[in-house]
Amino acid sequence: MDLPSLALIVGAAAFSPNPDERRAAEQSLNQLQHTPQHLIRILQIIVDGGSDLSVRQSASIHFKNFIAKHWEPHSGDQNIILPSDKNVVRNQILVFVSQVPPILRVQMGECLKTIIYADYPEQWPELLDWVKQNLQKPQVYGALFVLRILSSKYEFKSDEDRAPIHRVVEETFPHLLNIFNNLVHVENPSLEVADHIKLICKIFWSCIYLELPRPLFDPNFFNAWMGLFLNILERPVPVEGQPEDPELRKSWGWWKAKKWIAHILNRLYTRFGDLKLQNPDNKAFAQMFQINYAAKILECHLKLLNAIRIGGYLPDRVINLILQYLSNSISKSSMYNLLQPHLNTLLFEIVFPLMCFNDNDQMLWDEDPHEYVRKGYDIIEDLYSPRTASMDFVTELVRKRGKENFPKFIQFVVDIFKRYNEASLENKPYRLKDGALLAVGTLCDKLRQTEPYKSELENMLVQHVFPEFSSPAGHLRAKAAWVAGQYANIDFSDQSNFSKALHCVISGMCDLELPVRVDSVFALRSFIEACKDLDEIRPVLPQLLDEFFKLMKEVENEDLAFTLETIVYKFGEEISPYALGLCQNLASAFWRCIDTDNGDDETDDAGALAAVGCLRAISTILESISSLPHLYGQIEPQLLPIMRKMLTTDGQDVFEEVLEIVSYITTFSPTISLEMWSLWPLMMEALVDWAIDFFPNILVPLHNYISRGTGHYLTCKEPDYQQNLWNVISVLMANKNIDDSDLEPAPKLLGIVLQTCKGQVDQWVEPYLRITLDRLRGAEKSSFKCLLVEVVANAFYYNTPLALGILQRFGIATEIFTLWFQMLQEKKKSGARSNFKREHDKKVCILGLTSLFSLPAGQLPGEVLPHVFRALLELLVAYKDQLAEAAKAEEEEEDEDGDDDDMDEFQTDDEDEDGDDENPDETDGSTLRKLAAQAKDFRSYSDDDDFSDDDFSDDEELESPIDEVDPFVLFMDAVTAMQVSDSPRFQSLTQTLDPHYHGLASTIAQHTELRRAEILKEKLEKQSSATVAS
């Protein structure tokens, strides 16, 4: 196809108003992209100056997307770009990247990045030569542009992956330095010079970010670079051409150059500013840097900051970077000594004014309060903010040099409070008071710990903070709420002051100004956490929740959801009357958050975080009503659309949170509805396609489906859940590219089926064992090998003759027994077990081995029985001891935490299983809360080889029918049966035992009698309770 025709198709695909024509053009492009030289022809359209710019732009987007998808195919995918086409593209893109308009250069840069990251140096070794040659030509922008992309590839690479950048630095930096030097000495430099300098700085930054390349350790070479950096940093920017608009001015090339130089100097100071942190090889260089440059940079920074003191301009990001440098200097004696003479001016005339409410804040407050709120709670904004850097400077100053500075600064704040109180209403310094309150809130940790301030905090709040809740200045009402929240947990001598602050904050939720309402909600979280008497809040809880959801409709912020979580935690079951409404509102808020995709990355990020917060809050509500199962049926329909949509690729960013909701509903609903069953295929499809990292999370609802909906799991044929489970597990277990640790939930699932569906899934025992044994042969991680062996144990417990017959038919029964007994015997240096460390592991092994022990003489090989018997004796005693240790630890924990509030019941990572004999259908509120914690802490199901046995405690295990089986009773019943049915066999077995094993047998016999008595007692108590209830 000729170029004009292709250009028409590209234009039609992007701009045709006719949908059919647009679809046809897109289809043509999809077909053409697989033809040779397609990519080359698209590139020719992009660089054709005679073509319409909009068509060229459309072609550049198509070009970028195609390269991103196909330049470096994923493993197993076919490479659809011919090597010859790649060579042409690589050569031509270098020529044209500096010639196309900036709007196209952005797309070309993305393409170059993809190609360089994929091909350099292996497939594109000549790239460095091209850069070096073009750095020596008059027009260097293209070479700088390419070198910037090349250097960025290695910016965050670790040592072994950084090797190629060393040659890049060696061969290009001498030329870069020459170019930089020429640019610095241009008279009346243009903006193009600034753009070139900025590019050079960004290249330098990428090359030094993780380590300083060896050529720069040469003092002469390094000094030459530093001289040029300081020259640009110190010299005034040109007055001509500087934009008036503050937003455009901060992005102006000359200010950008200063910003990148400040970046570089901060990085060098962080790396070489402290001799104590240097290795021997770097010590001499670090000393040279400190002597020659650390103080010089400090002096230069102070001069720059002085400009804003006298009304000059400095971009926010540059101020932020300079204050970071000064903050890092406070702890170093030599640097602090240089800073000290300037400290009063710096602290009171530069830093503090930056902390105060200013004209830009007022303009944003008035014109776009939503943006004001977003910026105030945006972590990324904090990284760039002069105000945050000022707060950090003050914090570091009072922390490291508090003796001489803390009293002085607090007195300065107190003086502002006095001036404010003494001034008439029309002359009150509202903005200074705002800065003083910010300072008091910022230093809350220090003030709470230091006398005499600690004793005066309550009085300070009453005199200087509480009155501002009714200030005519909205920003002071907001700041009062924030400061009150910072001090909500101090010990109030007069509880009425706590109550007053709490009710002022609650009133602030109805303020006319949005930022006041938001700050009040966030402060409320601190007050609820600190509140000892919930009667303070109970009467206004409905109003609180109403105001809360009005605010959620206005603002997308994850902290709003955190506040709601705190309310739900604190009130527990009391929240149940509001649970349905809360979930409805949160679901609506969630959809609003994910529908805010408007091309603004900052807004998208805020919306995504807020969406996660909504889902977390929903989970917290579901946990709080876990002892009221009937409510789940009302809430489920509100959440089903979210679950259905977000269990697909659309929900990858919230997949874990959605699985948590699925887990709660499938755990606590009276029955699992057909609508909830419809989510099974979505989870399984995701698991195979992209969600292997979430396998432990998916395990929880799958377990619930199988164990709580066993009948439906076994009988349903459309879809066939049994077949679907096998299809997924067999694919995953056969995939050698998946790590053992990622597959640990797979054998757990097989065990769940065998335990839950005993006698009903005979047809699956052989395939389960086959896939398990195939994976066992190559398994390396010990915890994964244990889980695979436990599938065999579960198969024996499911149907011993069937499972043993399958192993014998496979010809590996002896091999499996040998491996199993060997793993049971393996010990660490400490003497602790290397394998089967958890209670659940031991119990599964005991049940499987006891099932083998119970086989008649003709079915189990005679040489295996003594090994089985001895292994059981050791396992049972170890299991008994572990249960006792866990019970003791739990008792001690209850003694320590008996008075803790409901929130502490969530901290169940180290709690033991509830007991073997508890009927899961008769779980009380306490057990339900533990199960809720179990559903919440998904990752606890993975064993961790890094734990020592001393630190190790069992996972909260998923409930199973084997919880009702007492392994001691099962074993002793099997022993008794053998004594009765085959006395000679039993005598032969016991005669081979040495005194150690006789002792173990005696211990187990005594403990079993104790267990029988306990079981009988529990049974009688349950019968008695049932009689009373009836």
From Swiss-Prot:
Bridged cysteine pairs (disulfide): none
Location(s) in or outside the cell: Cytoplasm; Nucleus
Chain intervals with Acidic residues compositional bias: 890-924, 943-964
Disruption phenotype: No visible phenotype under normal growth conditions.
A single GO cellular-component term on record: nucleus
Residue list for modification N-acetylmethionine: 1
Domain of life: Eukaryota
Function: Functions probably in nuclear protein import, either by acting as autonomous nuclear transport receptor or as an adapter-like protein in association with other importin subunits.
Name this protein carries in UniProt: Importin beta-like SAD2 homolog
Organism encoding this protein: Arabidopsis thaliana
